Amino acid sequence: MQQHYDYIIVGAGSAGCVLADRLSESGQHQVLLLEAGGSDKSIFIQMPTALSYPMNTEKYAWQFETVAEEGLDGRQLHCPRGKVLGGSSSINGMVYVRGHACDFDEWEAEGAKGWNYQACLPYFRKAETWTGGADEYRGGSGPVGTCNGNDMKLNPLYQAFIEAGKDAGYPETQDYNGYQQEGFGPMHMTVDKGVRASTSNAYLSRAKKRSNFTLMKGVTAHRILLEGKKAVGIEFEQSGEIKQCFANKEVVSSAGSIGSVQLLQLSGIGPKTVLDKAGIEVKHTLEGVGKNLQDHLEVYFQYHCKQPITLNSKLGLISKGLIGTEWILTRKGLGATNHFESCAFIRSREGLKSPNIQFHFLPAAMRYDGRAAFDGHGFQVHVGPNKPESRGSVEVVSANPNDKPKIEFNYISTEQDKQDWRDCIRLTREILNQPAMDAFRGEEIQPGLNITSDEAIGEWVKQNVESAYHPSCSCKMGSNDDPMAVLNEACQVRGIEGLRVVDSSIFPTIPNGNLNAPTIMVAERAADMILGNTLEQSNNTPVWIAPNWQETQRMRPPKRDLSSISSIA
């Protein structure tokens, strides 16, 4: 076995596959990619509609759980992370949301110098081929294919949801990944010609054709090998055998917001109290490793549908078989979409410059495991506040790499987070009770019309909220005078030579949207940094900000306000 490489990357996920491709592209560098999981060649991964299967299986995902979360009355939430080629991009819901421009300007304000929106935009474009074609926001020749599924053509509910948002006084946006995030419009997904556009399909497939690239699967990384304050390699286990490999240039951890923390701490890099408690020798004290953990939560707002047009009629075995057969033969139809084809981003209150609430609309009422929520037809909106104040932590509990770490998100632990949820429930109910939904909207199944007071909303949210599976920010970038910053603006671990982290853990703050798109962007930009390339930069590309955002929460008053809604339902 070859033991020496130029670059060693741990984790073939959303970021690791990008790095593997870009670092091996010139043919000048020997690149090794280590992955704990195995092949992604399964219809349950490749067919978009099957998205609920891989994230719930041991084969394709680390089945982590949180501790009993105090803010959720002691509930433990599921926290699956990809353990397969493509990582979480092979098990996620394929929703393509870059985030708001203000999110990246916020990163820079938090100390991640140079990570403002104008610096990030070229790398979003570089990664993408958008079916609508290239413009100053969207990419036209990148590895990741993005689209709007079936362009909302297969169900009238998608457009009805957008019209309801307009009825409620919110703007319409044609492209939330472009000039204007705020508003109601079509939703985009990482689906390329009907197939999941994971980073394995988009990037790793290219790297695997190169003689200077090596992929090793079924590998458990034990620790980063250090010589003093320099990273020189990785110790790992494969088929029960402990092995070592060495990096001439750099080691890069792309193991994700749980895995990268675990690897650093197992290597003796992290908070002294955590390492001492776990019985790990402290090699380098960095208090921020595993801190600042953030996530998105969501609830499902569900209604009966008065017309028999929803996907609830497609959940039987015969229907699934027909959908699967059409997809196998044509890569088209209901198999070629994640079914989230319309969406919205709104501000919950005046004084916010950019949105903090996200909606995914689904023309079905089901649970995340893919089973029906009730008999008959229904629809639902996945909704939650996307800019939480709550911060959590990841901590290893022992020196054994096979022991699951302690994950505590500290969900809904601030007064503002609680208020955001109250606003979220009330605003969502108001939107879904606008005239545009009258022809379709039946009884409100959940939360239920009795959930109206602050106390009732708070209790219902605690019992019904689920993770949107967006753990992030646990190895944040920051300035040298920030004692909790794990990385500098070049993704380098502070105080350790030859070691970087490149994945969603490096975000200083969680963006307003799903995490796959910004994670790919981060990896594209980090690849240029690692290779010493000149960083690309946009030139003041304009971004829509709501006029009078300081004084108004939305553009116009709703056609129906909340006080009149109880009489409609």
From Swiss-Prot:
Q: Which InterPro entries match?
A: BetA, FAD/NAD-bd_sf, GMC_OxRdtase, GMC_OxRdtase_N, GMC_OxRtase_C
GO biological process terms on file:
glycine betaine biosynthetic process from choline
Q: So what EC number does this one have? A: 1.1.99.1, 1.2.1.8
Q: Which residues form a coiled coil?
A: none
- Pathway, per record: Amine and polyamine biosynthesis; betaine biosynthesis via choline pathway; betaine aldehyde from choline (cytochrome c reductase route): step 1/1
Query: What residues make up the catalytic site?
Result: 470
The cofactors named for this UniProt entry are: FAD
Role, per record: Involved in the biosynthesis of the osmoprotectant glycine betaine. Catalyzes the oxidation of choline to betaine aldehyde and betaine aldehyde to glycine betaine at the same rate.
Stated name of the protein: Oxygen-dependent choline dehydrogenase
Q: Please name the source species.
A: Vibrio campbellii (strain ATCC BAA-1116)
Please spell out the taxonomic lineage of the organism that makes this protein. Bacteria, Pseudomonadati, Pseudomonadota, Gammaproteobacteria, Vibrionales
Encoding gene (name): betA
